[in-house]
Amino acid sequence: MRPPSWGTVAKYIWVGWAYLFLLAPMAVVVGSSFDGATAYTGVVFPPQELTIKWYQKIPSAHFHALGLSLGLALSVALGACLLGIPAALGVVRGTIPGKSFFLAFFRAPMQIPAVVTGVAFLRLFYAAGDATGVYLNASFAGLYLGHLFVATPYVIGTVVSVLQRFNMRLEEAAQSMGASRWRTFRRITLPTIMPGVHAGALYAFMVSFSDVPIAMFLTAPGFVTYPVELFFGIETDFNPSVLASASLVIVFSMLALLLVQKAIGLDSVVHSGNSR
């Protein structure tokens, strides 16, 4: 049996370092959450003694914030798909002039710093509130609109990339055999673009769930998303219960990715996203 070449060894070493770089921060967070030191002096890894007491001391506010973030992210992903799919169809199939301009316009929110977006929506909601008496800041609707603004371009981008490779003769063949436009869309177009929809929805969910800058401007005490709650916990009274809370989210996120892989396959999601 021939020994592996230096190139093969170097490849495995490089891949190993890449995995270590990605997994080490999560391993430190999860491992430190089990440290049982009586006097907390900082992040301890590896833990000196094992305990689960910090999981029992996770503040109830973290679970409330987690529920808010999950509900918000799911609704944002759904709304981004409802807005993004028609927009992508209009850009690719429409006969309007200046398609490249509209595509660049739809992608603009991805290029704007999130802090600028948060400030802009805060000022917009205050101005609209002064005019109408309805203030959307520190409300679910306001936070939803802010996240929808930055999440929808991901759905547009992934669906556009699929539509640009779509063979329109399939639709023409279906319509030539008597299928209506709606039936053609439901049976031919929609199943074909679903990998792009899945990719965009996943990106939209992650953008909303992990956002801090926009939520910092659009939340208030008692109405805080999970990342902001973690941020405040680390800033004011950092202790291992914060690490325990973050560890639960890490574990559940990995389980969710496994479910996505089982249901639709991450390969289709990644390929659709990379083709933008």
Model-flagged regions — what are they?
Residues 1-7, 74-106, 119, 123-127, ...:
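Transmembrane-helix boundary motif in ABC transporter permease subunits
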Residues 13-26, 108, 118, 149, ...:
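Transmembrane alpha-helices
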